[in-house]
Amino acid sequence: MRGVSTPDRRPVLPGLALTLIAGLCLVPAAPAQEADPSEERIEELERRIEQLEERLEAEEDAEPEEALPDDSEADPTTAELERRLEILAAELERQRLGEAAVAAGEGEHGMGPAASKIYRTAEGLSIGGYGEMLYQAPDSTRDDGTPSGRGDELDFLRAVLYFGYKFNDRWLFNSEIELEHASTDQEGSASVEFAYVDWLARPAANARFGLVLVPMGFVNELHEPPIFLGARRPDVEQVIIPTTWRENGVGLFGDAGPFAYRTYLVNGLDASGFSARGLRGGRQKGSGAKAEDFAWVGRLDWVDTPGLLAGVSLYRGGSGQGLTDPAGRVIEATTTLWEGHVEWKKRGFELRGLAVRGEVDDVARLNAALGLEGEASVGEKLEGWYLQAGYDLAVPFAGLRGSLVPYLRLEAYDTQAAVPAGFAANPANDVESWTLGLAYKPIDQVVFKADFQDYDNEAGTGVDQVNVAVGYLF
């Protein structure tokens, strides 16, 4: 219940979260209770890191000298010393955490770090997972001054377990079982997010069979909380690309020179679930999926430059699934989505951008079949984009433990960028937003996030909100 004290009460939880994040950065490491079996290796790595740091300092303090033309034994450059230092630091972290630890960011074949554990397993069973708890505090009023009707919420959003089994070097099974909102009694659910069999033939060509994640954008495949910025996933990758999006299908994946690719044939979307708010309701999620119409999806990424990922993806297929208009004619509802994405990470900087556009055919007849009128039309065109930047303050400030990343994200999307003649677009579906926040990771596998989101739309009904989240993977 909100009263006059609401403005004073609202910042309490976010403020506590920011205080906790700041405090965790300064907490000293707990002393080890007993010697680790790898202690000698750890001491050796620490010694080598110290030597490299001393050489770097000496290199920076020294006067520049002209290199000799035949100086094949010249000392390594500063950049090379820094590269070696990063490699040793990563190895030291792995030794300290143990072999069972998942290195955040090290995914394989389009899967997240924890989801990729099975690929690093010699044989037999692999278990991993992730989870996230989210506090959301929306404003009590909309931009136009009317009540938002929304209250604060604290939700254990997801608890996920990965189960994989490697039969041999060629064949493996991988799956994700997701529990949402903690209890099925409170609008929660239990779902299979993916379940597939891989045939690992060769690096350039492998096969996948089963319930697969559609390879579009960043977050649909890589959605483990410690590996993306923001207490909440980007809106563009929920509204235009309907994350988490999975369908039944078969396909190929692999690495070809400097490129990585994935291409699948999957059951199509179900247009009877489309609405003015997008395609999200058309996902079939592998459950009794209608298969009157199929779709093709393909993705190609440049992965040959360290720290750089750049690529495109395309989805196209029928979504009618046997639906007919009032005249009895079959509706194809051919649906096309294409997107481009780029991510660059270097020395603490993290930049990410994505743009996506979608088209749906036969929308006038689809509206008639679904009984949609006025501003409720399905969009003939949908579009969105976002830009995101973050910087790890632990890079220049060596005293900070873990990772501390302030971030900013700008987004815009419109689920009714075009509608058929005789219909109107709802201005509330033309949205712009910005997100400003802070993410702290004491270790790679655990993250605390807090951010503020400002929402504006053409109807003036945007509702700003504060979010605080904790996430993990293993």
What are the residue ranges of the model-derived segments?
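N-terminal secretory signal peptides that target proteins for export/translocation
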Residues: M1-P11
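Loop-centered beta-sheet repeat module
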Residues: G273, G278-L323
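Active-site rim elements
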Residues: V239, R283-S287, E375
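Outer-membrane beta-barrel pore domains
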Residues: S148, A195-L200, N220, F228, ...
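N-terminal periplasmic/intermembrane-space "pro-region" immediately following the signal or transit peptide
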Residues: A30-E132, D139-D144, F474
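Outer membrane beta-barrel
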Residues: A114-D143, S148-S272, E292-V297, D301-L309, ...
